[in-house]
Amino acid sequence: MHSRPLPTLGRHAARSVLNSPNFFIGNRAYPLKSSVGAKAILYTAGILGGAFAGYYLFNARSAIHEYLLCPILRLATPDAENGHRAGIFCLKWGLAPKLLFDEDDEVLHVNVFGTKMTNPIGCAAGLDKDAEAIDGIMQGGFGYMEIGSVTPLPQPGNPKPRFFRLPQDDAVINRYGFNSSGHDAVYSNLSKRVTSFLKSYFAKDNEIDKLSLYKNKLLAINLGKNKTGDEVKDYLKGVEKFQSHADVLVINVSSPNTPGLRDLQNESKLTDLLSQIVQKRNSLIQNGNVLGAKTHKPPVLVKIAPDLTEPELESIAVAAKKSKVDGIIVSNTTIQRPDSLVTRDEALKSQTGGLSGKPLKPFALKALKTVYKYTKDSELVLVGCGGISSGQDAIEFAKAGATFVQLYTSYAYKGPGLIAHIKDEVTEELKKEGKTWNQIIGEDSK
């Protein structure tokens, strides 16, 4: 079929428009006095378009991260550990999105360790093992950030592959085995960050007195032991090395990937270990911290496994009370493989290591409820961790006894926007109930 030629008048009109010195919006013509004007409009449109695209790309609330960028990253990195490293690289160098206009609603504020933390959503240990990307992660909206685990000496961890995705379950299995750059390297990273802060304009803000370097947000350092290290001395070395840099110190005795580590959860061993750690912490109080405080007494938390019986959890509560630590994180990864797993690849889901993500939630929540049963009459702070991926999950953990919560695996799957979505969901639900976060802590047991 032959195309129909333009009528004579139409051809003249078309040429007139194409050669017109006017810029058209709809049927209205705006005169362009020169090609310079045309270029200016095009450049302006390009700049505005680029600015909008940049704002969308670097705004943590954008859905593009969960539905496009994170899936692309997973496709580009079949080896999950390479994906982890790529994520840390982006967070470290400012290539990750930030939560713009991050002002938390008052209903999210939580009183913990003498601080009114801006929100109860924390980043769990394991994401940033070597303190490389603290700011990139904190700027996503967390109220609490935990680095590590950090071991005294550098160690490579277990042989690769050691990190596996179960995307159908929003879960991962890891057997990293405390791979760590060691105390000195992590201390150097932390010191450089503090030095840079003290030289900056923000150091003049007297309200920033937390070692996170963010107002009313906390930085925790998770301490581990070397594979062949002494089960007490390694932790004491960590306290001595990092007390001046940490708002909170965490003692990890629950990783399933270091031989014999979970044996430290035995009541007598745990009481002895934690008592010595608290004594070491107390002996260093007068040394102050790197921000110039004359005294500094970071709370000590112990992180436990979910794979414990009620009597074992009760004995941990007893050890925590006897040793006078400040709280318990419930929980680490699980060595169980629940029947609820959607993944059908037996070789994949039977990989040795700790399972985290959505399938961990029922185990962690059950353990938390049990620990709260034996600690609610004390001043111990409980931290909920395991399978949290929504505002409703966070609220469940709070009502079960958690003062605040932590997550990691869901953040890796859904991207930085998850934190804003969780905070929005929690805020909406709390306002619907006419309550604050502080008011719902332990509500299920009242």
Swiss-Prot record:
Positions bound to FMN: A125, G126, L127, D128, K129, S149, N222, N252, K303, S331, G357, G387, Y408, T409
Pfam families: DHO_dh
Catalytic activity line of the entry: (S)-dihydroorotate + a quinone = orotate + a quinol
Names of the cofactor(s): FMN
Any one annotated GO CC term: mitochondrial inner membrane
PROSITE patterns assigned: DHODEHASE_1, DHODEHASE_2
Enzyme class: oxidoreductase
EC number: 1.3.5.2
CDD domains: DHOD_2_like (cd04738)
Note accompanying the cofactor annotation: Binds 1 FMN per subunit.
Membrane topology term: Single-pass membrane protein
Transit peptide: 1-13
Active site: S255
List of residues binding substrate: K129, N174, R175, Y176, G177, F178, N252, V253, S254, S255, P256, N257, N332, T333
Residue spans crossing the bilayer: 40-57
Localization per record: Mitochondrion inner membrane
Presence of keyword Cell membrane: no
Family matches, as Gene3D superfamilies: Aldolase class I (3.20.20.70)
GO biological process: 'de novo' pyrimidine nucleobase biosynthetic process; 'de novo' UMP biosynthetic process
Functional note: Catalyzes the conversion of dihydroorotate to orotate with quinone as electron acceptor.
Note from the entry: S.kluyveri has two isoforms of DHODase, a cytoplasmic isoform and a mitochondrial isoform.
Family the entry assigns: Belongs to the dihydroorotate dehydrogenase family. Type 2 subfamily.
Protein name: Dihydroorotate dehydrogenase (quinone), mitochondrial
Organism of origin: Lachancea kluyveri (strain ATCC 58438 / CBS 3082 / BCRC 21498 / NBRC 1685 / JCM 7257 / NCYC 543 / NRRL Y-12651) (Yeast)
Organism ancestry: Eukaryota, Fungi, Dikarya, Ascomycota, Saccharomycotina
